Amino acid sequence: EILIGLVGSEMCIRDRFKDNTGGKNADYIPYLANIDKNLFGISICLLDGRTITLGDSSYCFGIESVSKVHTAILALRQYGAEKVLKMIGADATGLPFNSIMAILLENDHPSTPLVNAGAITACSMVQPLGKSDKKWEAIVSNITDLCGSAPQLIDELYKSETATNFNNRSIAWLLKNYNRIYDDPDMSLDLYTRQCSLGITAEQLSIAAATIANDGVNPVTKKLIFDASLSPKITSLVATVGFYERTGDWLYTSGIPAKTGVGGGVMGIMPGHFGISAFAPPLDSSGNSVKAQLAIKYIMNKLGLSIFGSTRFTITG
């Protein structure tokens, strides 16, 4: 039996890593380059709805690629697992998250909704087709359901992203060339850019992760958000490519499927136990938060947990 109070020790976790100077803010998006590099927050949401929050867990940061998990869930809710597999796919590319080469090498499908090409395709699939405002409402409503509270669009980040997303424009139209996008490419790209520009907190992301870990039931609102049969599909997508080309190393050392974003957030799913999120802007060379990785790995190792193991424990306190 491991007491949750041990996991929640700020001295033991946050203070252990807060002075780490590794990594640097994403500098190709001006808004992200200017975020305070010393921000650092951690949140754990248990399946009974209790949350443990440390440091800057209520700071609103850009969700960026962590939003791909949420839109993948929306696609699964609207189309079902079989159609999503056929229309997008579930394979890791082994290449960077924004790779155009991955599309050229496997032009029969975008590979997975958790890389840029697949995420833009997922946005194109959002119903109702052809109606940008309604599609956006569906995207925001889905994220609100998962997090238990609404995200807020960061206008400055959206403008910054829109002004610099040349690579994603190429991806959208290349998908169109291969008939792997299902609505207007420019509309789909704008929806994707907007969803990446949503402001979110570590606490909100931990609740979303706990909803996945809890078979689709939000542990805070107690509402059923999606069918329990989808939870293993979502977790498998995250386990396969959540850290892009570094996913294998991450799973090997942490034992928890997690999705990362260049805004500095990491969201981890421990099925049947909890959701966890950590946030710190400085990134490693693969675009993953240095301190968030350290904190989550530390917690998982302290608990002796792995999604691939048979360890059982009880959370008390």
What are these regions (language model features)?
Residues 48-49, 62-85, 208, 276:
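Active-site SXXK
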Residues 1-8:
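Single conserved hydrophobic/aromatic residue that forms the stacking wall/gate
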Residues 32-35, 111-112, 163, 255-259, ...:
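Short Gly/Pro-enriched turn/cap motifs at secondary-structure boundaries
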Residues 58-60:
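A short acidic/small-residue loop/turn micro-motif
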Residues 18-54, 267-268:
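A short, well-structured edge-of-sheet supersecondary motif
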Residues 9, 13, 20-22, 75-195:
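Active-site-adjacent helix/loop patches that line small-molecule binding or acyl-intermediate pockets
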Residues 162-165, 173-233, 284-289:
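Penicillin-binding protein/beta-lactamase superfamily catalytic region
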Residues 214-317:
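Structured C-terminal helix/loop/strand segments within mature extracytoplasmic catalytic/sensor domains
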